[in-house]
């Protein structure tokens, strides 16, 4: 398990763009499972949407990417480096995510060649799929 300080030692993201609160489990180069507690205090809800707050899908995708980056950047050969989005395929949004929800995100790495990684990501709320996607990472 990794807390926010340990996550910040791996990822370059900081408030307001560090979107995962805790890593529940991970195996370097294999998978990571993270949690994001969605709070009404997040600035995005001032405009998306007043009176009907909904977490934007791009924030869910970014939280997925950060989760996958933990699985990649904990490999010895990538420690201290940065993982960038290389692409998103087949993103599907299946459930609205609102303040008070807890996203559980799992990213399983399926391919890793040189500095390119591909992973399958799923985000759930209370066991219900909120988003699925295939993510490509580029390590710099």
Swiss-Prot record:
Broad class of enzyme this protein falls into: lyase
Organism of derivation: Latilactobacillus sakei subsp. sakei (strain 23K) (Lactobacillus sakei subsp. sakei)
GO cellular component, one term: membrane
Name this protein carries in UniProt: 3-hydroxyacyl-[acyl-carrier-protein] dehydratase FabZ
Active site: 48
SUPFAM superfamilies: Thioesterase/thiol ester dehydrase-isomerase
Biological process according to GO: fatty acid biosynthetic process; lipid A biosynthetic process
Catalytic reactions on record: a (3R)-hydroxyacyl-[ACP] = a (2E)-enoyl-[ACP] + H2O
Gene field: fabZ
Function noted in UniProt: Involved in unsaturated fatty acids biosynthesis. Catalyzes the dehydration of short chain beta-hydroxyacyl-ACPs and long chain saturated and unsaturated beta-hydroxyacyl-ACPs.
Known EC number: 4.2.1.59
HAMAP family reported for this sequence: FabZ
GO molecular function terms noted in the UniProt entry: (3R)-hydroxyacyl-[acyl-carrier-protein] dehydratase activity
Similarity comment text for this entry: Belongs to the thioester dehydratase family. FabZ subfamily.
Keywords: Cytoplasm, Lipid A biosynthesis, Lipid biosynthesis, Lipid metabolism, Lyase
């Amino acid at each position: 398990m990794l807390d926010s300080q340990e996550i910040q030692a791996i990822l370059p993201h900081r408030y307001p763009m560090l979107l995962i609160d805790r890593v529940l489990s991970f195996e370097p180069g294999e998978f990571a499972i993270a949690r994001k507690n969605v709070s009404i205090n997040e600035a995005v809800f001032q405009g998306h949407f007043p009176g009907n707050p909904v977490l934007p899908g791009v924030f869910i995708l970014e939280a997925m990417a950060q989760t996958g980056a933990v699985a990649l950047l904990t490999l010895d050969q990538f420690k201290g480096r940065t993982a960038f989005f290389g692409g998103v395929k087949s993103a599907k949004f299946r459930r609205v995510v609102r303040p008070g929800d807890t996203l559980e995100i799992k990213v399983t790495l399926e391919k890793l060649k040189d500095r390119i990684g591909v992973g399958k990501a799923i985000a759930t709320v209370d066991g219900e799929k909120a988003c699925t996607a295939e993510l490509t990472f580029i390590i710099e």
